């Protein structure tokens, strides 16, 4: 197999994973407020779940990126799927507020684990001659997935909410198979920032009242 073919396969795998994950994530998130209202829950309850959901999904990447650098991207990708799939299945199985909240927190946690990994893979598999193109394609795929997911979920939830959630579970399951069979571990730097320092950075971020308030407000009004 030629080096060019290897690179092309790696890029296709990375983009497929990102497209499927954005489909799974936004397919659930964009319709979640409608779903919760259909079950009779209030906007205040929606705000609580969304605040915690965004809190996890935007802070966990700091830690998951460090784990990927230290233990390998493929292992952390699989960990994300193992958090994602049971959470979506729980969302299918429960109608209680506590159950739905737990499912969404786990989905936010899983999305946070996944979030930096494909961007990190693109960074490690490109160089100064093609990095701009690589990231341009990457973010185009992010936008396609973010648009495609809600459209598909919207069509499916017109039949049943279960079908909409199942489409996300299927997408993550396909990601699992693609990762096991085709994902190639990118070369990693020999110098890895200590996990303890990353955790201290998170605590420093959380101590910023303005930033924490922003996350809460984002959840309430998203």
Regions found by a protein language model. Give the residues of each.
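Symmetry-related core transmembrane helices of the 12-TM Major Facilitator Superfamily/SLC fold
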Residues: 163-181
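Structural signature of the two symmetry-related core transmembrane helices
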Residues: 75-90
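Glycine-rich segments within core transmembrane alpha-helices of 12-TM secondary carriers
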Residues: 132-151, 157
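Flexible cytoplasmic inter-helical loops of multi-pass small-molecule transporters
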Residues: 183-201
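Central cavity-lining transmembrane alpha-helices of secondary-active solute carriers
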Residues: 51-64
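Intracellular juxtamembrane helix-capping segments at the cytosolic ends
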Residues: 113-126
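Helix-loop junctions at membrane interfaces in 12-TM secondary transporters
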Residues: 92-104
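Helix-loop boundary and gating motifs at the non-cytosolic
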Residues: 5-54, 222
């Amino acid at each position: 197999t030629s080096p060019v073919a290897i690179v092309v396969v790696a890029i296709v795998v990375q983009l497929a994973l990102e497209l499927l994950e954005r489909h799974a994530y936004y397919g659930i998130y964009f319709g979640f407020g409608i779903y919760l209202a259909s079950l009779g829950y209030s906007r205040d309850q929606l705000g609580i779940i969304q605040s915690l959901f965004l809190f996890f999904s935007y802070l966990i990447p700091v830690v998951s990126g460090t784990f990927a650098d230290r233990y390998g991207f493929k292992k952390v990708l699989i960990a994300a799927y193992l958090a994602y799939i049971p959470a979506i299945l729980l969302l299918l199985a429960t109608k209680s507020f506590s159950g739905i909240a737990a499912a969404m927190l786990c989905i936010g946690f899983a999305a946070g684990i996944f979030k930096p990994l494909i961007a990190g893979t693109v960074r490690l598999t490109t160089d100064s001659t093609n990095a701009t193109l690589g990231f341009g394609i990457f973010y185009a795929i992010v936008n396609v997935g973010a648009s495609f997911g809600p459209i598909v979920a919207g069509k499916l939830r017109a039949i049943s909410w279960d079908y909409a959630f199942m489409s996300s579970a299927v997408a993550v399951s396909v990601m699992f198979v693609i990762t096991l069979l085709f994902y190639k571990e990118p070369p990693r730097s020999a110098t890895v920032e200590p996990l303890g320092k990353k955790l201290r950075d998170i605590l420093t971020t959380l101590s910023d009242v303005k930033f924490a308030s922003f996350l809460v407000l984002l959840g309430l009004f998203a």
